[in-house]
From Swiss-Prot:
Keyword list, A-Z: Capsid protein, Host cytoplasm, Hydrolase, Metal-binding, Protease, Serine protease, T=13 icosahedral capsid protein, Virion
Pfam families referenced in this protein's UniProt entry, alphabetically: Birna_VP2 (PF01766), Birna_VP3 (PF01767), Birna_VP4 (PF01768)
Transmembrane regions listed in the UniProt entry: none
Amino acid composition bias (Basic residues), ranges on this chain: 975-986
Site positions per UniProt: Cleavage: A441, F442, A487, A488, A494, A495, A501, A502, A512, A513, A755, A756
Protein name, UniProt field: Structural polyprotein
Residues in Peptidase S50 domain copies: 513-755
Length: 1012
């Protein structure tokens, strides 16, 4: 398969490009091996809305070339008018000879408003029609929705601000390269001559019987009589040719005919006009043959063609009014659309209609088209091309997925936000190793897993790290696991019932896990077992490609089991971990067939189904239980597995059964593990703990149990039972168990995660952890702090958080972050990530809770205003309202807590007089009378200001009173005897005095005094 080097992802690039074209092009993995280059071409258009606010965008989502679609605006007469063609940014025929379309997506939306418009109005209808454009019978805004009955091919009433996305899905996989109509070297008399090489592959041919002994009769008219001989629907956006012949017969002498062919566009206008006969004279009494052959190149087709029409003009040489003109015609013609039957060339079409958009608004069309292109000889000199890779697994997987696209929710037209939300789901579909959690939430998981089992190599998909092993064995997963599978710390049994709990010494163990997981050097040492090299391990879960059952809201306790395969001395082994669930009751219907019918009795006589019948289970239970293998846990639901797992035994299972019997959890979040294997040999270190931890972590679960319980069982399993009592009544005497005894109605239980730690286990650290656990059981605040620490340590962000505390010593940033952090399932999170991935939506508060929150909110607001008597209890007694004006006045005047529901109206209407001081009145009078430095206000003005203060009960003047005081001040200033005399105003019209004697400016005049 593709990308086998990546052990965590196994992407099929072709289907990823089909479902998400913006991720780029990918070679089609079929057997058409041509050297090509991959190219992604964008298309971006800003279309102006017409006067009616309505329009239509026609897309050809599967057309292999530069043509993307066309835009039409709706006129006031109800007809569409062609606006422009929509093409890719680059003219592909200018540089490339051949093309194959890989994928295409286009988005239509509007986010701009013309001047004077303040609201973004308008809606969009979109439909993918599995036919040609000419076959549409109703192209109105509402009529488009009747073009198809498939709900996945149409959407209606999408706001133009949100927009729609058109996704091109292939209609066929037998695709060859198409000639693009590229120019070819040619020399002619006309320097503007153009010669192109068009596609001849899969032409579409329309055969039309133009006339079959058609009889025409009319009287002479000046200019001739025009008649439409035929009109037929055709579809063309590329070059076409028209060939045929007509035969005319007449008995009238001097009859002249002219014939014209019209190619008509979608809007009803003639796009191309060609005369096939002009003033051809007909000979009476004989067959007059009129052959014609037309070729229309692609560059002359400026808009989509949807029909063809042939008109005949009849006239008579030297005719007089009333002369008879009659003739008969027969013949046929053929219209050949070059490449018209290529898959996706003319059908299907996607139509996007918008309505009630503001005139002058801009509708944006943006998208991407991915191609396989073969360059022309000139470009090939500088462009490296490569062969495509034939991958039948990827091709079959793509075909099977798209064949079930209606069941998998894969549409051709989407609301843009919904398409964005589905991108993570599409990534799961394209990744063969994805756990399909989002697909499981939508209910598509069973279908996709069944398709994976059919389409791709089973072992490579289900157990990626074992892909080389699977290729070496050459067998399926059923044989790989088989009945000879065995488990440590939960041992699977063979069909014969013999225990296969022991294996040979492991010399080399390759563990596919993160750092911090322990590797077992010598797992078991028992005689009569061969030495095995090259054990391959993985922390994942062995998965079978089977349909899953889902048990919703089932209370359960989960526990991991380590499984190893045993074939023979020459076959490599595989080590993996599987998760099991303990469910209350007899539920053999949930078990795989390999586990049914096997049970073990407990000390109290009850049965545990799914266990190997090996003696008596050393537990006292109050009811029957069933052990089932699971594949996933999602939204508090258990995804059951149908893998052929034999019955099991083991300490972790015993602990899980005892835990289930005591606590009976309501949701499956508990994972029990002892950390000790069920083996008949000595163990050097904690065996299989890391593999179990990885399995629990992959499901996002915590482990509850001693984890690193240090035991030395020796060869006797009963010795371990004595040292580790499984009787639930003895659990309160086991200080090393992280299983707090809580009542059944306590809801979700919290357990310290026994996960792989970044800290190295030491005796001192273990003592400190036990001390903290003991303190947590006593102090709830310390338990909360410890849970935060364990959360930081489990997710590996202890160091990051320590660095963050240095930059935020007072926790201001952290407090603001927590206060403003959006919650899962909130409106902002759904808008960003969609509804996929979230479990149960957050429950809204009850009316009582909402009322209490409101009371608390009002109380806090009053407290910020200095009103401390309005406690939440007082607000609740006051009718869930804050203090009234009367209550506030009462509290301000008396400093006593007002009675709830008492309005104290006397304190509202009876104003308490507050006298202003003489200094305050003098300061106000001085300020009103004049600026500082002027004369002091007279006593009469001060008395006027004092009257205003008295009227206002100690408050200053309002605006009207201020105007009156200013006028009074002006009058008093004019009649004040102490005010300065006014300066005389110069007369503006007084003539200036001229110097006597007309002397110069610098000559001094001589007076009589000077002469004396």
């Amino acid at each position: 398969m593709t990308n086998l080097q990546d052990q965590t992802q196994q992407i099929v690039p072709f289907i990823r490009s089909l479902l998400m074209p913006t991720t780029g092009p990918a070679s089609i993995p079929d057997d058409t091996l041509e050297k090509h280059t991959l190219r992604s071409e964008t298309s971006t258009y800003n279309l102006t809305v017409g006067d009616t606010g309505s329009g239509l965008i026609v897309f050809f989502p599967g057309f292999p070339g530069s043509i993307v679609g066309a835009h039409y605006t709706l006129q006031s007469n109800g007809n569409y008018k062609f606006d422009q063609m929509l093409l890719t940014a680059q003219n592909l025929p200018a540089s490339y000879n051949y093309c194959r379309l890989v994928s295409r997506s286009l988005t239509v939306r509007s986010s701009t408003l013309p001047g004077g418009v303040y609201a973004l109005n308008g809606t969009i209808n979109a439909v993918t029609f599995q036919g040609s454009l000419s076959e549409l019978t109703d192209v109105s805004y509402n009529g488009l929705m009747s073009a198809t009955a498939n709900i996945n091919d149409k959407i209606g009433n999408v706001l133009v601000g949100e927009g729609v996305t058109v996704l091109s899905l292939p209609t066929s996989y037998d695709l060859g390269y198409v000639r693009l109509g590229d120019p070819i070297p040619a020399i002619g008399l006309d320097p503007k001559m153009v010669a192109t090489c068009d596609s001849s592959d899969r032409p579409r041919v329309y055969t039309i019987t133009a006339a079959d002994d058609y009889q025409f009769s009319s009287q002479y008219q000046p200019g001739g009589v025009t008649i439409t001989l035929f009109s037929a629907n055709i579809d063309a956006i590329t070059s076409l040719s028209i060939g045929g012949e007509l035969v005319f017969q007449t008995s009238v002498q001097g009859l002249v005919l002219g014939a014209t062919i019209y190619l008509i566009g979608f809007d009803g206008t003639a796009v191309i006009t060609r005369a096939v006969a002009a003033d051809n004279g007909l000979t009476a009494g004989t067959d007059n043959l009129m052959p014609f052959n037309l070729v229309i190149p692609t560059n002359e087709i400026t808009q989509p063609i949807t029909s063809i029409k042939l008109e005949i003009v009849t006239s008579k040489s030297g005719g007089q009014a009333g002369d008879q003109m009659s003739w008969s015609a027969s013949g046929s013609l053929a219209v050949t659309i070059h490449g018209g039957n290529y898959p996706g060339a003319l059908r299907p079409v996607t139509l996007v209609a918008y309505e009630r958009v503001a005139t002058g608004s801009v509708v944006t069309v943006a998208g991407v088209s991915n191609f396989e292109l073969i360059p022309n000889p000139e470009l090939a000199k500088n462009l490296v091309t490569e062969y495509g890779r034939f991958d039948p697994g990827a091709m079959n997987y793509t075909k099977l997925i798209l064949s079930e696209r209606d069941r998998l929710g894969i549409k051709t037209v989407w609301p843009t936000r919904e398409y964005t939300d589905f991108r993570e789901y599409f990534m799961e579909v394209a990744d063969l190793n994805s756990p399909l959690k989002i697909a499981g939430a939508f209910g598509f998981k069973d279908i996709i897993r069944a398709i994976r089992r059919i389409a791709v190599p089973v072992v490579s998909t289900l157990f990626p790290p074992a892909a080389p092993l699977a290729h070496a064995i050459g067998e399926g997963v059923d044989y790989l696991l088989g009945d000879e599978a065995q488990a440590a710390s939960g041992t699977a049994r063979a069909a014969s019932g013999k225990a296969r709990a022991a294996s040979g010494r492991i010399r080399q163990l390759t563990l596919a896990a993160d750092k911090g997981y322990e590797v077992v050097a010598n797992l078991f040492q028992v005689p009569q077992n061969p030495v095995v090299d090259g054990i391959l391990a993985s922390p994942g879960v062995l998965r079978g490609a089977h349909n899953l059952d889902c048990v919703l809201r089932e209370g359960a306790t989960l526990f991991p089991v380590v499984i190893t395969t045993v074939e023979d001395a020459m076959t490599p082994k595989a080590l993996n971990s599987k998760m099991f669930a303990v469910i209350e009751g007899v539920r053999e219907d949930l078990q795989p067939p390999s586990q049914r019918g096997s049970f073990i009795r407990t000390l109290s006589g009850h049965r545990v189904y799914g266990y190997a019948p090996d003696g008596v289970l050393p537990l006292e239970t109050g009811r029957d239980y069933t052990v089932v293998p699971i594949d996933d846990v999602w939204d508090d639901s258990i995804m059951l597995s149908k893998d052929p797992i034999p019955p099991i035994v083991g300490n972790s299972g015993n602990l899980a059964i005892a835990y289930m019997d005591v606590f009976r959890p309501k949701v499956p979040i508990h994972v029990a593990m002892t950390g000790a294997p069920n083996a008949c040999g000595e163990i050097e270190k904690i065996s299989f703990r890391s593999t179990k931890l990885a399995t629990a972590h992959r499901l996002g679960l915590k482990l509850a149990g001693p984890g690193a319980f240090d035991v030395n069982t020796g060869p006797n399993w009963a010795t371990f039972i004595k040292r580790f009592p499984h009787n639930p009544r003895d659990w309160d005497r086991l200080p090393y168990l992280n299983l707090p005894y809580l009542p059944p109605n306590a809801g979700r239980q919290y357990h310290l995660a026994m996960a792989a730690s970044e800290f190295k286990d030491t005796p001192e650290l273990e003592s400190a952890v036990r001390a903290m656990e003991a303190a947590a059981n006593v102090d709830s605040l310390f338990q909360s702090a410890l849970s935060v620490f364990m959360w930081l340590e489990e997710n590996g962000i202890v160091t990051d958080m320590a660095n963050f505390t240095l930059s935020d010593p007072n926790a201001h940033r952290m407090r603001n972050f927590l206060a403003n952090a959006p919650q899962a399932g909130s409106k902002s999170q759904r808008a960003k990530y969609g509804t996929a991935g979230y479990g149960v939506e957050a429950r809204g508060p009850t009316p009582e809770e909402a009322q209490r929150k409101k009371d608390t909110r009002i109380s806090k607001k009053m407290e910020t205003m200095g009103i401390y008597f309005a406690t939440p209890e007082w607000v609740a007694l006051n009718g869930h309202r804050g203090p009234s004006p009367g209550q506030l006045k009462y509290w301000q005047n008396t400093r006593e807590i007002p009675d709830p529901n008492e309005d104290y109206l006397d304190y509202v209407h009876a104003e308490k007089s507050r006298l202003a001081s003489d200094e305050q009145i003098l300061r106000a009078a001085t300020s009103i009378y004049g600026a500082p430095g002027q004369a002091e206000p007279p006593q009469a003005f001060i008395d006027e200001v004092a009257k205003v203060y008295e009227i206002n009960h100690g408050r200053g003047p309002n605006q009207e009173q201020m105007k009156d005081l200013l006028l009074t001040a002006m009058e008093m200033k004019h009649r004040n005897p102490r005010r300065a005399p006014p300066k005389p105003k110069p007369k503006p019209n007084a003539p200036t005095q001229r110097p006597p004697g007309r002397l110069g400016r610098w000559i001094r005049t001589v007076s009589d005094e000077d002469l004396e």
